[in-house]
């Protein structure tokens, strides 16, 4: 582990290292400007994962996250959540470990998994999930928020995840009845002492990291407020307390949502894990 107290020290440490780093964590308060170091670091180590650590809002900086391929922002809490810190950095280094709702829950937990291949499956699963969530959320407004986010993820997987050989989307909203043989959407829902959670995974892996980053940037910065594409991910991020995007190209795409039992999360983290 190499540490630095300012940009000058950080640059010197990076330049004097003869082996690639596994990952780099940069405090947003690194003086005088953390992105001065990141820009220099990216020239020497273009593929090393970089994460930011911050206690303040960072969404205005999203274009810089996109520019420098920063796919994780860890929110500093008091006390610091070392489990969250360790898991996030491990996910960046070993992205195959990032998949699955259980990765983000702690024992003791409850976890349910269901496969969706038809509209009937989707409707039955959603009713089962809502009954589960109602055990922990007595207010209809909370349930409506979770349901909206969960359904948005499932719809995104069905209507945007499956494509024809031409690249065109295979299933149309309002016309979907059943996936073709070999296609499936896997959903999970569960809880631990801190969160309710859900995940949606398609077995196509058509989600593209650069497209995801650009769409989120346009929505977060309000440049794409009228865009028809990209609203789904932005909506689910807004409705949840934590969102994790996991991509294994041509294999599977997954989004995990977490909803805190205590709504004290003021700054939302950012997690995007990509298997190269």
Feature map (PLM): residue ranges:
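Conserved beta-strand-loop-beta-strand hairpin that lines the nucleotide-binding pocket
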Residues: 105-110, 158-276
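Alpha4 helix (beta4-alpha4-beta5 surface) of REC/receiver domains from two-component response regulators
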Residues: 32-36, 40, 45, 55-75
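C-terminal output helix
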Residues: 60, 77-89
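Bergerat-fold GHKL ATPase/HATPase_c domain
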Residues: 87-148, 159, 163, 268-276
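Acidic, metal-coordinating helix/loop segments flanking the phosphotransfer/catalytic sites
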Residues: 3-23, 31
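Conserved polar catalytic motif of the HATPase_c/GHKL fold
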Residues: 152-156
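His-Asp phosphorelay/catalytic-motif detector in bacterial-type signaling
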Residues: 20-22, 44-51
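Two-component signal transduction core modules
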Residues: 24, 50, 73-75
